[in-house]
Every structure is written in structure tokens, then in C-alpha cells.
Amino acid sequence: MYHKSDEHILDNYTFGIFDMYFGNHKICVLDIETTGLSPERSHFILGGLLSFEGNNKARFTQYFAESLSEEKEILERYLEEVGSHDVVVTYNGRNFDIPFLLTRAKKMEINVDNHPYNLDLYLVLNGHSSLRKLLPNLKQKTVESFMGLWAFRTDKISGAESVTLYHEYLLKKEKNEDTSAHRDLLLLHNQDDVLQLSKLFPVLEKTDFHKAMYTLGFPVISGNKKLFVQNITFEKKYIKVSGVQTSLPVDFVSYGTGNDDCKIFFSKKSQTFEFFCPIFQKNDFVILDLLKLPVDLQNVFDEFPNFESGYLVFMSHNDIKYREVNFFIKNFLLKVLEDIL
């Protein structure tokens, strides 16, 4: 196994909406290299990880398999480091990188108890921005060019070429020939993908980020207690929120005796949670009465234009107020984690 770690100086990204969901969380950026697209038949050969350490500093780490027999070793080390973070940023990672890693881990009987929330920039851009209409495609390099980042790339190969390059590397190694040039090209390609992705955060300002988080879900973290919100739905008399417990799962049930009470369910066995909070309709508005909650959240919404006298508007003329809905869910669950569980 070849392991590399070095420090980089990067500008800290700050954006109010981003910080609402991910402020004070331990964030990393990852990209992986494999011998193919199928995790059933292909191998994980290289993982790059950029971990933000504060004060404009970040640590970039790579794990490289010098032979296919080292796959399990680098996968264990890589997943352990990824799992020490709260949020992992990827580009199409929900469709490729993360499922690939988890499938390979399962095949190799590697236990993955703790995994971070995956913020997939591709899914945010594809579903919640106008860039899809403006650009020929949403490949990472295309978006980099649009954001004026292309000049920062130094690698000259594509993902497909990296597969060929790795096979050439293995052949040279079998013949006891010098493999350093091939290895360094692979490492450079992976490094550029990760570092360039870390510079793409400002593209989020061109998205409807609140809507993206409503659709894709978001983390709620208090100390070592972590929840990932996955589904938000409006029913006739309730807003229903469900997701997973990703660390220290617990069993907990809370519900009142009336029809207008909140209901909260946490399952240790399934590592899931869900809660229902009563809502009501007034003309064309869907409203939550904060006074009927088991936790006090009134002061949280003082600056929100859709909050008045203890009432929070969730929907107006079928227009969902994504910021209000998400902010309520996050703060409600934080109160549950901190004051009840």
C-alpha cells in the first residue's frame, strides 16, 4: 500500500445558506479510482480525501493499492478516515462512489458502522439549478470550466484512461520495471479531481439550495448523536419526517393523548426515526402552531417573515416554504437530541 498525506492552504468557504445546514460540521471531499464501473466485478484502487481543518488549512490524504491484493487494506483505512467526518462532499457520489465503496466493503466483510452524510453536488446542480439548461452537460470538468477553475488543473488524463494506466502499472510491476511515473500520474489525476471539487462550493449559490436539501435530505448532529433526514411529506393533518440514525441508535417513543399532539418514534433495531407534527390549513396557507410542540422553538423563528404570534407558515398557495420547513425540522430534532434523548 502506498499512503500519502500533505497539507494544503485553501480559502474557507462561507455562505449563509450552506452554513445553516453544515456549519460546525467536520467536512471532507472525496473521489475514488476503480478498475471499472461495477463494484461486483471491479476493484477499488485509489481513494483521495480532503479534510478541512480550519484556518484555511486542509489535509489531503491518498491510499493507493500497489497490487489488487491490497484492496481490502486500503479500503479499511480509507473508510475509517472517511467515517471520522460528519459530511462527505462528492460529485455523483450517491450514484457511484459511495455505493461502490459500501458494496466492496460488504464483499470483503468490512464492517461500516458509521458513515457521514453525503452532499452530492451533482444532484444539487442537476435537480435544483438552471445550469443544466446553460451548459452542454454537468460533468465535473464542464462545471469547473464554467466557474473559471479549469486553469487550476494539472492532470492530463480522463477517468477511463486512469483504468488503462493502472493496468499498465501492474504489468510494469510484474516485470520489476519502474512504476513511479504511472503511479504519480494516477495520484495526480485523483488529487486534481478532489481539489477541484473542493473549489466548486461557490456553485451552490446558483442553486435553490433550500429546495435541494428538502429533496435530498440533510444531517442533524448534536455531539456524537447523528440523524440524517431523508423524507419530508405533507399529509392532511400532519407533516411527516423520517430518516436514519447513523450513530448510537436508540429506542424512543413519545406521543400525547390528543389528536393534535406530536408523535416521535426512534427504532434502535432498524436505526430509523420518524415524527409527525400537527398542521392546519387556513385559506390557502398550511400552518404549524409552535405552541403545540413538546419543545420550545419560538425564539428560533423571530426573524422569519413567515412567522407570527407562534404560527409558522409552511405553505402558501401550494408554494412550499423550504427554508422554514427545513429550519423547523433541524431545530426540532436538535431539541429532541439535546433535551429528550
Label for each model-derived stretch:
Residues 1-42, 52-341:
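DEDD superfamily 3′-5′ metal-dependent exonuclease/proofreading module
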Residues 47-49:
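Short beta-strand scaffold segments in enzyme catalytic cores
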